[in-house]
Amino acid sequence: MPKANNAVASKARRKRVLKKAKGFWGSRGNILTVVKHAVDKAEQYAYRDRRVKKRTFRSLWIMRINAAARLNGTTYSRMINAMLKKNVEIDRKALAEIAVKDPAAFTVIVKSLFE
């Protein structure tokens, strides 16, 4: 008796993997064994970079705050220290947004910290 391979499930599985590889170049997008490796690696990078993104954005916010602080005659570290001493609880994301979108308001914040 011939072996039943369950073609429906096999085809669905292949289709699912190939769908994840849409847009991949060359054999990475159409040869199943290569596609499996490419998709696995892509998912590893995606997992890692979801975490790296948080670090990258925090770093960007700090750079923006530091640049704006230096325009106002202080530095990032002095400003954060003053915020801690005065119990000002504005997070870095919001501070960076204020620094970019409304420099006048940022200047007011800096002056209030060093009074």
Swiss-Prot record:
Keyword entries, A-Z: Ribonucleoprotein, Ribosomal protein, RNA-binding, rRNA-binding
GO molecular function, a single term: rRNA binding
Keyword S-adenosyl-L-methionine carried by entry: no
PROSITE patterns according to UniProt: RIBOSOMAL_L20 (PS00937)
InterPro entries xref list: Ribosomal_bL20, RIBOSOMAL_L20_CS, Ribosomal_protein_bL20_C
GO biological process, one term: ribosomal large subunit assembly
GO cellular component, one term: ribosome
Annotated protein name in UniProt: Large ribosomal subunit protein bL20
